[in-house]
Every structure is written in C-alpha cells, then in structure tokens.
Amino acid sequence: MKGKGEVSLNHLKLKAASLLISAALLAGCGLTDEKITMKPETGESIQVTLDRGDDFSMEASSGVLVVYQKKKVMMRCAFISREQEQAQRASIITMPFEIHREEENYISYSMGGPDGMVNYYMYPVGKKTWLYAATHLPPEAAEKVLSRIHFKEGSE
C-alpha cells in the first residue's frame, strides 16, 4: 500500500509533465516572423522582416509593401533611390507640412491629404535604397508599426 505522500508526488510529476508538453505544443503554435524580399529599381534586394505578433501581416504588390493589422492597412511602403528621396524632401517645402524629426539620413513629417493627415517616413534601408512610408496613424502609433519592420540589404 502506498502512502499518501507517494501518491501526491506521482500526481505532481504527472501534472508537471503535462504542463511541459502543453508548453511545448503552444510554443510550436507561435507566430514566426514574415519575410518578403523587395527588388526596387535601385538594383538592390531588400529583405523585409515583420514581427507578426498582434495579428500583423504584410504583402507586396507592384513594388509597394503594405503592412496590415487584422486586415486593416497600417502603412504603405515604397523603396526609392537617394535622388528620389532628395526630390521628395525638396517638394515638401512647397506645401503645408510639419516636420516631426529630421536628421541627415532620416525624416518624418505630416501633410494634409484628401483623406486627412498623412505621416511620412524616409530613411535608408540599403546602400542605394530608401524607405518611403506613409500612414494615417498618428506619429506614436506609426513608430510602433515601424519598430516591427526590419530591413536587411542584399538578402535573398
């Protein structure tokens, strides 16, 4: 006859084993990062990696990368040359705009559009390629979306 302490110990071992199995199964269900390789007109290959947590996803069509959360468009991203980036910077001064942050290789600004305020982001993601992203999200929310997207030049 087994004592009360032995039954409890075996019972605890079974519970611990089932918890470990459950944790391992749940870990296998986790979302992995999504990757897309963009090939802009600059000639570079830019690997884009998205953290898919919180129901984020992305797709590429006609050279534009669209980032979604729960199937709602969060941001549109194009890949442009340094010359196009400089032309875009020069053109914004001809319209009402507000700069949120400007550095040598980074700018974020807002402009009114037909569908309301649009926030733009431009910064290099390769040796010859710049990200040109647009969103209707406020700057703080847009920064959170951008923090989920990672770029690596030259990857296939």
Label every PLM stretch briefly.
Residues 48-56, 132-156:
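Surface-exposed amphipathic alpha-helical segments
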Residues 26-28:
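C-terminal motif of bacterial Sec signal peptides marking the signal peptidase cleavage site
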Residues 42-91, 110:
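Secretory pathway targeting signatures of secreted, lumenal, and periplasmic proteins
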Residues 30-32:
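Bacterial signal peptide processing site
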Residues 92-137:
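Signature of long, low-cysteine stretches enriched in small and polar/charged residues
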Residues 72-78, 85-86, 114-120, 129-132, ...:
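Short, surface-exposed beta-strand/loop "edge" segments at domain boundaries and coil↔beta transitions
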Residues 6-17:
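Bacterial N-terminal signal peptides that target proteins for export
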